[in-house]
Regions:
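Short intrinsically disordered, low-complexity coil segments enriched in acidic
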Residues: 1-4, 173
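Mid-domain catalytic core of redox enzymes
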Residues: 3-102
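Generic recognition of stable, solvent-exposed alpha-helical segments in well-folded globular domains
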Residues: 5-10, 37, 86, 127, ...
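Conserved FAD/dinucleotide-binding core of flavoprotein oxidoreductases
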Residues: 8-13, 43-45, 74, 103-135
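Tryptophan-centered motif/residue detector
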Residues: 50, 123-125, 160
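A glycine-rich dinucleotide-binding beta-alpha-beta segment and adjacent secondary-structure elements
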Residues: 65, 84-92, 146-173
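Structured binding elements
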Residues: 140
Length: 173
């Protein structure tokens, strides 16, 4: 079987559990498929200035992860259904390379925010989303002072959103 979707969707929905051996069904059923990354989109009124980066560097993929201890702490928080006080982010500003993504003078920032648990203890209510978004923007401010003032529009897709909107099992991508 060749498939472009995750193993659970492939075997459960496309092939059908009734068409495969019990051992395979058990292994597929036991796969952990809960995502732990959120997707952030920001519409910005201008290009953000990250401290210490020149224009060429700003156009590259930016990883915000000061040290291994922070990664470990963020992972542990997610493991227990919480988001970390300091997130790990993979940030890009694609409009620096493709001006059609935003109106003239404006930009878009896209980030993968690691260790955002699918099963957040308090659930992904609007209050939880707002708290997480505030935390992310506050952290971005440490690296790109003034970025909060540039935000025209923002969107946060949690693992639950990714599961529901894009049919990604467990919001895992």
């Amino acid at each position: 079987v060749v498939s472009n979707v995750d193993p659970k969707a492939t075997f459960e929905n496309l092939v059908g559990f009734n068409n495969i051996e019990t051992g395979v069904v058990r292994r597929v059923s036991n796969l952990r498929m809960q995502g732990n990354a959120a997707k952030l989109h920001l519409a910005l009124s201008a290009v953000p200035q990250f401290t210490g980066l020149d224009d060429a560097q700003l156009g590259q993929r930016l990883i915000i992860s000061p040290n291994m201890k922070q990664i470990d702490q963020a992972f542990n928080s997610a493991k227990y259904g919480e988001f970390s006080g300091e997130t790990i982010m993979d940030v890009s500003i694609p409009s620096l390379h493709d001006s059609t993504l935003a109106p003239e003078g404006s930009h878009v920032l896209s980030a993968i925010v690691q260790y955002a648990p699918y099963n957040l203890k308090q659930g992904w209510s609007q209050q939880a989303r707002d708290s997480f978004m505030s935390l992310i923007v506050e952290q971005l401010e440490q690296y790109a002072p003034g970025i909060g003032e540039l935000i025209v529009e923002k969107q946060l897709l949690t693992p639950v959103d990714l599961s529901e909107k894009f049919n990604l099992t467990g919001g895992h991508w």
